[in-house]
Amino acid sequence: MEHEVAWKKYDEVDLEALEGLASNYIDFISENKTERRCAATAIRMAEKAGYISLADAVREGRALSAGDKVWAHSHGKALILVQLGSKPLSKGMNILGAHIDSPRLDLKQNPLYESNGFALLDTHYYGGIKNYQWVTLPLAMHGVIAKKDGTVVDINVGDDEGDPVFCVSDLLIHLASQQMDKKGNKIVEGEDLDILIGNRPISLKGEGAEGECANEGDEGAKDKDAAKEPVKAFALKLLADKYGIEEADFLSAEIEMVPAGRARELGFDRSMVIGYGQDDRVCAYTSLIAQLETPADLAKTAVTVLVDKEEIGSVGATGMASNFFENTIAEIMELAGEGGMLPLRRALSASSMLSSDVSAGFDPAYASVFEPKNAAFLGRGLVFNKYTGARGKSGSNDASAEYVARVRRVMDDAGVSFQTAELGKVDAGGGGTIAYLPAKYGMDVIDSGVAVLSMHAPWEVTSKADIYEAYKGYLAFLKNA
């Protein structure tokens, strides 16, 4: 059974809506390259749509009822949006769940060093990457540095016009005979992914006015360090001048190195999007927009969960494995007059969820790892993965046949183009999502997202048609599941 290309059904109204959504999506992923930025932007968008802080509602003892809209965050890196429906929460919710973290290079806690006239930053890669894809690539620096006095400094270098960028260097082909004989996972080792940030030494006293340092007291010791590592010293001076930070402040920093530059339209026909972090911000954004556009006269409560740490196992306080989701729903039920452990358990088990995560798009350049009858194709709509996992579905959530049938009905009734797929051929590899975690409550969960080419590469590819169908499908699910 072959699914029709979604583009064929669009009229001018559809195309205008599709292009508008794609344009806003390109802006979103270009301007929000970290989980913190995604969460902060989503909160601003939610508040414009009438959402209020759950923390404020709890503090004020405000009762919640049908039509009320609240948001809650965890450490600024995970977010839950809830719009209450007319039915009791204990009758279940319709939930979308996506993640807003993406593979990247994180700075180590003690990252800065000088070597042979270069200042560099040591990194530890985050998530599953092919190390060799990250060399000679313009990189931007995003994140925060928390100082001992309690202030938090935002770092954003490399994406504004006129900003410098950074990179990991590579070995010239003329001397790479041994390197080229290595396996792909050894061509560039993780410890070699160090960021080149400077080559200019500081000017010490007596050597020139710029970058001058004093020679008394503690400053004298700093001068000795600067004389020993002048390029590192100049980098530190620039950081101190711009951000008011010192080297020790890296100990309490979260700084991510990500591909520099905006997402772009791809192809002569502009039918695709190429950009960083589309796994899984393409599903996060479409889920967010669907949640914000959910109509006021909702029967079942609509929920969108945007979580962190999926790429490393959904662990920690901001991952789906934490109690953030459960605790937030408990707080809302208390304010809605449905407090208590038993109503909470009933609400969770009676809920339905789409785990909004991307799927591997069929790539004709690598056709051998796909089984075409059960592969996702760009341009054919929203993808449903009944199960994921690897090696005999290990680690997957396997949605029930009855739930798949119900989701099919919702999509068909809304005119949503969709397809079903596995990640690839049996035993070719595999992967997982957050789906198995909410499923532990007994709720129905199925993976549902957008097909992606070059997944986990610095630049990933999606189809505008699939982005549009994902938005339509997520909205239909929140309204009618």
Residue ranges and their predicted role:
Residues 1-481:
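N-terminal hydrophobic/helix-forming segments and targeting peptides
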